[in-house]
Design a protein with these regions (language model features):
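Assembly/interface hotspot detector across virion components, adhesins/toxins, and nucleic-acid enzymes
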Residues: 3, 51-53
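Bacterial N-terminal signal peptides that target proteins for export
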Residues: 1-7
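Primary mode marks residue(s) on the alpha4-beta5-alpha5 output face of response regulator receiver
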Residues: 21-48, 55-173
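Short, conserved catalytic or interaction motifs in soluble domains
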Residues: 18
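C-terminal motif of bacterial Sec signal peptides marking the signal peptidase cleavage site
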Residues: 14-15
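Catalytic core of nucleotide-sugar-dependent glycosyltransferases
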Residues: 11
Length: 173
C-alpha cells in the first residue's frame, strides 16, 4: 500500500519533533518576553491535603493543601525527575529549582487544580534545570481537595488526590 506524500509529511514531521510547542495560556500565565521554551515535562502523582482548621475561621474545618508529590516524565514517557514541596523540581542529574507562584488561572477542565506561572527563586546544580527561570503548570487533571470527609474525627489526617499536569520550563534566550 502506498500513502501519498502529502499525507505522510505530517507523520514524518511529528516523529522528528522534539519539544512540543508551548500550550495556549491566558496572558497572565505567559513567561517573560526574554525567555524561550526548553522542555515540557509530564507529572503524574498526588496533591496532598490535611484536614485542619481554617485560618480565617478556626471553628470550621477544611482540606488544606500541603504539598505535591509527583514523578516527572519527558515527552517519550521516560522518568526524568521528581516534583515536590516548595514547590521544587529535581532532575535525575541533581539539578533543582524551587519556585514561587507568580500568577494563577482556573483550569479549563472542572475538577482540576489551577494552572500556574512560577518563577525560580533558587536554582542548584548543573544540568537539566540549571538555566530554568520560569515554569508553567498547565493541562491539569484532578488534584483538587476532597469535597467532604474533613470532620473533627479526621482532624490532622491527610488525603492524597491523584493528578497529572504538564510543567513547561523556560530559560533566558
Amino acid at each position: 500500500m502506498r500513502i501519498p506524500f502529502p499525507l505522510c509529511l505530517p507523520l514524518v514531521l511529528a516523529a522528528c519533533a522534539g519539544t512540543p510547542p508551548a500550550p495556549a495560556v491566558p496572558d497572565n500565565l505567559k513567561p517573560p518576553a526574554g525567555e524561550s521554551l526548553v522542555s515540557v515535562l509530564r507529572a503524574r502523582g498526588v496533591q496532598i491535603y490535611e484536614c485542619r482548621a481554617k485560618k480565617d475561621d478556626p471553628a470550621a474545618l477544611e482540606w488544606a493543601f500541603v504539598a505535591p508529590e509527583a514523578e516527572l516524565f519527558d515527552t517519550n514517557g521516560k522518568p526524568v525527575g521528581r516534583h515536590g514541596a516548595g514547590p521544587h523540581w529535581e532532575a535525575a542529574d541533581g539539578s533543582k529549582i524551587v519556585g514561587t507562584v507568580k500568577a494563577r488561572a482556573d483550569a479549563p477542565q472542572a475538577g482540576a487544580i489551577p494552572w500556574l506561572l512560577l518563577t525560580a527563586r533558587s536554582v542548584a546544580g548543573d544540568g537539566t534545570f540549571s538555566r530554568v527561570t520560569s515554569v508553567q503548570r498547565v493541562a491539569t487533571v484532578g488534584g483538587v481537595a476532597p469535597a467532604d470527609g474533613c470532620s473533627s474525627a479526621a482532624l490532622g489526617k491527610t488525603g492524597r488526590v491523584a493528578y497529572t499536569a504538564d510543567y513547561v520550563m523556560y530559560a533566558p534566550k
